Amino acid sequence: MSELVMDSAFFGHVLQDMGALIEKERDYLTGLDSDIGDGDHGINLSIGFREVNKQLDELLTVSPDIATLLKKSGMILLGKVGGASGPLYGSFFMKCGADVPGKTEVNFDELCGMIINGAAAVQHRGKAELGDKTMMDAFLPGVEVLQNRDTNADPIETFSAFVDAMHAGAQSTIPLIAKKGRALRLGERAIGHLDPGSESSWMLMNVILENLKKAV
């Protein structure tokens, strides 16, 4: 069991940094989506995370526990982010929060469980499998790393391997034909393009990694 402990302030910083990342990469993610989707992935995520960060101080004051913070953030994303990514990311954060009811601190094993179950909620919502050219092509390889982790290993090394697996999974979408979403209609024309949801998902999980490094 790791001694690494994360409190509500940690997750507040994560959400702030996720918002900053999305602002920085908004045009890049929107460009990816323009190739095979509606061309609004980065824009929609920007709208959602701006609203989360707008309400963040109030959320941390009114809802000091991690569960409520993440569930309310997920509900904001669900309501503010258009397209498929709103329900998917909303489901992820809401499930992460639901996993730790009333807690103001979680350890590394609990964090891993939150992410594993959050990814399962995304899969349940989107009904996507590995190879469908969706964010599950990033999440599923990453989840496998967390599920098979050595609980005695260094948490940073474990989470780095998780993020690396997600990044590789995102890259694996480039040669795929899409089986879900708007890209489905393109058929073979989707080959050669990176799935925007898989790209944003590993990038957002990397934000958690960077904050874990600061917490050690």
Swiss-Prot record:
Binding site for Mg(2+): D33, D38, D40
Any one Gene Ontology BP term: glycerol catabolic process
Cofactor requirements of the protein: Mg(2+)
Keyword set includes Metal-binding: yes
A single GO cellular-component term on record: cytosol
Cysteine pairs bridged by disulfides in the record: none
All copies of domain DhaL, residue ranges: 9-210
Alphabetical list of Pfam families matching this protein: Dak2 (PF02734)
Reactions catalysed: dihydroxyacetone + phosphoenolpyruvate = dihydroxyacetone phosphate + pyruvate
Binding site for ADP: H41, G42, I43, N44, A84, S85, G126, M135, R182, D195, P196, G197
Function according to Swiss-Prot or TrEMBL: ADP-binding subunit of the dihydroxyacetone kinase, which is responsible for the phosphoenolpyruvate (PEP)-dependent phosphorylation of dihydroxyacetone. DhaL-ADP is converted to DhaL-ATP via a phosphoryl group transfer from DhaM and transmits it to dihydroxyacetone binds to DhaK.
Name listed for the protein in its UniProt record: PEP-dependent dihydroxyacetone kinase 2, ADP-binding subunit DhaL
Organism of origin: Listeria innocua serovar 6a (strain ATCC BAA-680 / CLIP 11262)
Lineage: Bacteria, Bacillati, Bacillota, Bacilli, Bacillales
